Structure formats: C-alpha cells, structure tokens
Amino acid sequence: MSKGHSLQDPYLNVLRKERIPVSIYLVNGIKLQGQVESFDQFVVLLKNTVSQMVYKHAISTVVPSRPVRVPMLNPESTGNDDMESGA
C-alpha cells in the first residue's frame, strides 16, 4: 500500500506545513476550501472557519492556491519504495 502514498503523503505534508490554502473538489462536484490541518491513510482534515473531515475516497482533485514543490525523497529510485530495506 505504500506505493500509492509515495507522492500523496509528501504533497499533503507540504500543503500542511506551509499552510497553503487549497480547493478540494469532491467526486460529486462540491468545492471545499481551506488549509490542510492533518491527514492520514483515509481522511484529510480541512480547516476553514470550522474543521471538516473529508474522506479521501470522496476527493477528486486538490488544487493549491500557489505552486507547490514536493521534495524528492530518492530520485534514483524509479520503482522500489523499499528504501534501504535490503529486500
């Protein structure tokens, strides 16, 4: 399951750490706006005037208000997410 999170988690973490305002579009077309307060494997906590727990399976698109640079964890690794595991 970690392969699906190799880009998602660092991207959401940058949005959270830098408090970048985002628009989150849900699969039903609803647009939510706020800042990523926290996230885990299944949900994103979005904060505006209130905090909303948004299930990731309901999210279609995350649009930041400004460009986001996601640090590359291991640019040489093209298909192996088991970094330094020796496996």
UniProtKB/Swiss-Prot annotation:
The keyword RNA-binding applies. GO terms for biological process: regulation of DNA-templated transcription; regulation of RNA stability; regulation of translation, ncRNA-mediated. GO terms for molecular function: RNA binding. InterPro entries: Hfq, LSM_dom_sf, Sm. It comes from the Bacteria. Keywords: RNA-binding, Stress response. GO terms for cellular component: cytosol. Pfam families: Hfq. Residues 9-68 form the Sm domain. Transmembrane segments: none annotated. RNA chaperone that binds small regulatory RNA (sRNAs) and mRNAs to facilitate mRNA translational regulation in response to envelope stress, environmental stress and changes in metabolite concentrations. Also binds with high specificity to tRNAs. Belongs to the Hfq family. Homohexamer. NCBIfam families: Hfq, PRK00395.1. PANTHER family: RNA-BINDING PROTEIN HFQ. This is RNA-binding protein Hfq. The gene is hfq.
